[in-house]
Amino acid sequence: MKRVALVALLCAATASADELSGADKLRVVYSNQFSWTRDGLPVVTVRVMEHRPSVTLAADGIRVLPDGEGGPETRGGATWTVRVVDGKPGKVVTHNIVASFAPSDTEKLQAELAKWRAKKVQTRTFETGALFAVKGQVLDSRRILVAAAGTTGGTPYPELVERPRGTVEAVDDRGTVVRNDSILWFEPGPSGLIELRDVDNERGAKETRKYFGKLYVTVDNAGQLAVVNAVPEDKLLAGLVPAEMSASSPPEALKAQAVAARNELLAKIGTRHLTDPYRLCATQHCQVYAGAGREDARATAAVQATRGELLVRDDGGGLVDAVYSASCGGHGENNEHVWGGTPDPSLRGRLDGDAALAARLPKFAQIGEAELRAWLAISPSTDGPWCARPKEAQVNFRWQKTLDLAAVEARLAVGRLRDLTVVERGVSGRATRLHVVGDGGDKEIRGELEIRRALGNLKSAMFVLDLARDGGGHLTSVSVAGGGHGHGVGMCQVGAVGMAGAGRSYVEILRQYYSGAHLRKLY
């Protein structure tokens, strides 16, 4: 079995050495292994830039460490330009995953393997996720994946069979040159910050950003340079929380956001970027992170107030994958209806309200086609769903849009459109299958995100369509009435603000959005 997960023995005690400065730097940066700060916080590696032929860093008193902390170091000028010499891409092989099991499901795993053996199909197993032992409690996020050779239709799984290579060369503003095989570490001076220039921002422009902690520059899978921030969890969250939720939100909502973001950081270890020399990226794919200088004292206070607190499954299954979205539109969605896979008992879609609201709106416990139009007629109000109550609800709780038919037809590539029909919805009414008919044929689009993109980047897949046709049966206009913004799974951020505004605590907020789980202070 190919093992991707490592056992990380996590404790609040001070680490005696920096694990990221061990003898084999590349092995460590490609692994799921954590290092820890002296005061017992995990250090997370986040990619902030990649696919660059060269990068420029600056800081007063910067140290260049070819072998990490404890090895030789160079103190040069304040500005360093780093490039890759003779960079060679890594080699990645993609497998088709046909089944996934918990490590304890040995009988089911063996039955699956036997089924494929009987068909004379070669299989391999891969282990993803991580196993954490924290203060005597084991948190297991591992899954055993079964890949079947020569098959299609499953989930692609990348395996790094050959690491990228090259010489990383750094030159300072005095002409000092430092070279090392595949990686160089940079540690800041007294300010604790390193400046990185020409970072791509969310608008596609380039800007200078500052980062807490260390940066390492290494060869990425394209044979170019990746810049990775090895940042203590509290510093990372201090930047993440106000990027994900307005710092003017009530304190209890910010605390709920801090816990959810912390869970997301740790729950994703070993499940994403499996072929990359870092654990997470700084985009929406993982969590948005723009470095230092984006902190707000109110969000930082929420991070500090919930230090080490994580959502743990009641069944002992490990950390909750505490996903969240901007606005659920008043009803959450099940994880499997958005991303497929196994239903997660902690990510069940339900009415975004208390028992009194549920008693008032019993027919919306599950929203099917028949109820959806009535549901979308509900306007923001102070006695409605949690996400209908705060002022933030005005933007996304309910919305309307007229489709740009020419643009939609160009994307769908079935000729002039004749029909758009939602044929399957999730428990919140979100579309999960859309049937499209045009002069050039028909097709089916699966997945709420793919449907949103196909129809012109709709805010959410909780919508109904009103179609108008000409005498020849072609669509002449499509009006969309919708609710919410985002996938709707897990915590509704506007709903959290609404709950906090009604006097609910962050513990109650988390209980509303993540069932079958409880809070534990683990470090």
Summary of predicted features, one role per range:
Residues 6, 15-523:
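Conserved, single-site charged/polar hotspot
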Residues 1-4:
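Positively charged n-region of N-terminal signal peptides that target proteins for export
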Residues 11-12:
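Repetitive helical segments and hydrophobic/amphipathic motifs
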